[in-house]
């Protein structure tokens, strides 16, 4: 859990912004969202495999776009 020490004479909204940023960097909200409902191990593997296929296709497409230039 991220912790933020409030500096002297620091406005509350600035400290809150720093806390939100540290939570986002630590991935707290993403973790909470992923654990909100139970996901069967097979469903999790299937989702991760689909994400890997999508990432690979995106990478291949990016590489093809780069190599098309013939000038």
Curated annotation (Swiss-Prot):
Coiled-coil residue windows: none
Disordered, as annotated region: 49-71
Listed Basic residues bias regions: 49-59
A Pfam family the protein falls into: Ribosomal_S21
UniProtKB keywords: Ribonucleoprotein, Ribosomal protein
Family the entry assigns: Belongs to the bacterial ribosomal protein bS21 family.
Name recorded for this polypeptide: Small ribosomal subunit protein bS21
Source species: Stutzerimonas stutzeri (strain A1501) (Pseudomonas stutzeri)
Lineage: Bacteria, Pseudomonadati, Pseudomonadota, Gammaproteobacteria, Pseudomonadales
């Amino acid at each position: 859990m991220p912790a933020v020490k409030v500096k002297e004479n620091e406005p509350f909204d600035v400290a809150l912004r720093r806390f939100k940023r540290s939570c986002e960097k630590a991935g707290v909200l993403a973790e909470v969202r992923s654990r909100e409902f139970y996901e069967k191990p097979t469903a999790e593997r299937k989702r991760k495999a689909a994400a890997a296929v999508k990432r690979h296709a995106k990478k291949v497409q990016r590489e093809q776009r780069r190599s098309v230039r013939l000038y």
